Regions:
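Ribonuclease/tRNase effector modules and their secretory precursors
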Residues: 1-67
Length: 67
């Protein structure tokens, strides 16, 4: 997956789900409009590091607005 698609998904986020383990799940669109799931770890200084990115799985559809 291209870094540009991951950045696009985070910049054009449709849903953010903060997890209990200092990770954050973003649901957003790639440049071609495919929905992606992107997981970041939130560092102590507030910056984030992407640790997972792939096409959104159906189990996350519930996080989308209107679903």
């Amino acid at each position: 997956m291209a870094d540009e698609d991951i950045e696009h998904a985070i910049d054009n986020v449709m849903s953010i789900d903060d997890q209990d383990d200092d990770t954050r799940l973003y649901i957003g669109s790639a440049r071609n409009a495919d929905l992606l799931e992107v997981v970041t770890i939130v560092r102590d200084d507030g910056s984030e590091l992407v640790i997972h990115a792939m096409k959104m799985r159906p189990k996350y559809r519930r996080l989308l607005p209107g679903d």
